[in-house]
Every structure is written in C-alpha cells, then in structure tokens.
From Swiss-Prot:
Residue ranges flagged as DNA-binding region: 28-51
Gene transcribed to yield this protein: nsrR
PROSITE patterns, sorted: HTH_RRF2_1, HTH_RRF2_2
Pfam families recorded: Rrf2
Record GO biological process: negative regulation of DNA-templated transcription
Lineage, top ranks: Bacteria, Pseudomonadati, Pseudomonadota, Gammaproteobacteria, Enterobacterales
GO molecular function: 2 iron, 2 sulfur cluster binding; DNA-binding transcription factor activity; double-stranded DNA binding; iron ion binding
Descriptive protein name: HTH-type transcriptional repressor NsrR
Length: 141
C-alpha cells in the first residue's frame, strides 16, 4: 500500500507546522518551497486539513496557517483515515462475479485496520520530538 501524494504532503505539511514555534504562522508558499510541491496541490491539501480542524487558516496581511490543535493531539492514523481512500480493492457486484463468496476483501480490510492501529500509536508530536536532524533539514536555509 502506498499513500497518495495528497496524504503524503498533508502529513509533511503538518510535520512542518508542528516543528515551528507555536506562535509562528507559516504560509502555503513556505510549505511548498520546503517540499517542492505545486502551490495548487498544497492549497487543496491545506483546505482539507483546515476543514478537518487540523489547520487554522487566518486570512489577511498578518495571516497564514498553523496547527489547529496541539501536535500531541493529532494521531497519524486519524490524519490518514481523513485524507486517504482506504479501499485496497474495488469490489462491486457489477464488476466482479465472485464478490458474494470472496474472502480477500475481508483479509485486506483486516490488514488496513492493523495498519491504522499502528499509526494510531503515534502522534504528530512523536514525529518531531527530539528530532534534531528534522529540525536541521526543515528550519535551516
């Protein structure tokens, strides 16, 4: 399983915001510069994260973006659930004639649940706490 770029960059944006001092706002442009992703793509990601309450977006001259809640309260599993389409196979009566007897979907759903359970053990704070190499990469120019 590979996360979509939407989820990947959503997590990266959250990690960047979490690495900043709490009072510091950042901008979408700053995040796109750090990660080399298109501004249009990042705008969509930040809009979704804002809608979920994970990012506060403040408009105006002194505006910007920042985490919408403390990093210790943002579980990685919750972010992935919110951003990622988690169906590994496309099972429907119309496209597959073994759907009614297939056990593969059950096994794959169990695998997804184990994956998410592991991600739920980790918060955004865990990703940045005492991570000096991360700070050096993100916060030095």
């Amino acid at each position: 399983m590979q996360l979509t770029s939407f989820t990947d960059y959503g997590l990266r944006a959250l990690i960047y915001m979490a690495s900043l001092p709490q009072s510091r706002m950042t901008s979408i442009s700053e995040v796109t510069d750090i990660y080399g992703v298109s501004r249009n793509h990042m705008v969509k990601i930040i809009n979704q994260l804002s809608h979920l309450g994970l990012v506060d977006a403040v408009r105006g001259k002194n505006g910007g973006i920042r985490l919408g809640k403390p990093a210790k309260d943002i579980r990685i599993g919750d972010v992935v659930r919110a951003l990622e389409p988690l169906s590994l196979v496309n099972c429907s009566q119309e496209s597959c004639h073994i759907t009614s007897a297939c056990r593969l979907k059950v096994v794959l759903n169990q695998a997804i649940e184990r994956f998410l359970e592991e991600l739920d053990k980790h918060t955004l704070a865990d990703m940045i706490e005492d991570n000096i190499p991360l700070y050096k990469l993100l916060l030095t120019e």
